[in-house]
């Protein structure tokens, strides 16, 4: 696990629609070891390694959930809208970073009312998004604008990357910088002359899987492995039957989500690879969300796709948590699978005629 790369990626500000910082990190990381780097029309990062055999894509979306400045009042407070899925109770009094159009980062905090000034009824009611504001310590609109903050600036949670104990990693934007980091490690270490390997950092996943569609059209892959996160149900307050994934028990294979079913032969091949290498593997479903697999699997008449996810606590909030052991297990699983992949195996994934 390249913890330095993961930290660099997590500390980048790259809300959906503003992924340049992550794109730059991936360019600098992978340019020395790939044949070509290109981009689709929305800005998804595409690295190619090799030029022979079937096209195999490993995809991790670059964007994170965040906010955008929508109004600056006369007193210097900012109003904002959410980008991606947020729960309002996870937002109050958290520090944020505003990225100006020139790339300057301005710190702020989502303001909260002191309990002394709240009625008992108000204390029992969650604050709506429309009532929230951001304080950057300015005294007027003019001071805000002098610092370079404008309507339309993107806002991300403040970076807070850390390792806790021997196994846990905590930080913002683990969804889905872990996918980007793992994609990069695979491009650096997998050498299989039988396939053309693509590493994709897709854009705008959190607002509709948009970069998945455009990058799929750009590459036209034969097989796709999507890397993402999934809800860990091993904390108080979560139904662990609906959300069975646990940290430290291995990566999760997504059996279906709102927009995708995996190719069953691809699932069987990965399960066999995990068993052969004595790697733990969990299984999950997601009825209310989707991964980039939901766009890749229907492109060009349909493609074999599977989504593999790291169990993650506290998704779509300021601080998520993953297990290093789960990361290593998933990296080992995919590396082993890609290393032994051949054109014959790839073709077999799309053969649907029953053979006696």
Curated annotation (Swiss-Prot):
Keyword field contains Metal-binding: yes
What's noted on cofactor binding?
A: Binds 2 divalent metal cations per subunit.
Residues reported in the UniProt entry to bind a divalent metal cation 1: 61, 175, 228
GO process terms (BP): proteolysis
GO terms, molecular function: metal ion binding; metalloaminopeptidase activity
Signal peptide per UniProt:
none
What keywords are assigned to this protein? Aminopeptidase, Hydrolase, Metal-binding, Metalloprotease, Protease
Instruction: Kindly list the positions annotated as binding a divalent metal cation 2.
Output: 175, 206, 316
Please state the Enzyme Commission number of this protein.
3.4.11.-
Q: What name does UniProt use for this protein?
A: Putative aminopeptidase FrvX
Q: Which organism is it from?
A: Escherichia coli (strain K12)
Which taxonomic lineage does the organism of this UniProt entry have? Bacteria, Pseudomonadati, Pseudomonadota, Gammaproteobacteria, Enterobacterales
Gene of this entry: frvX
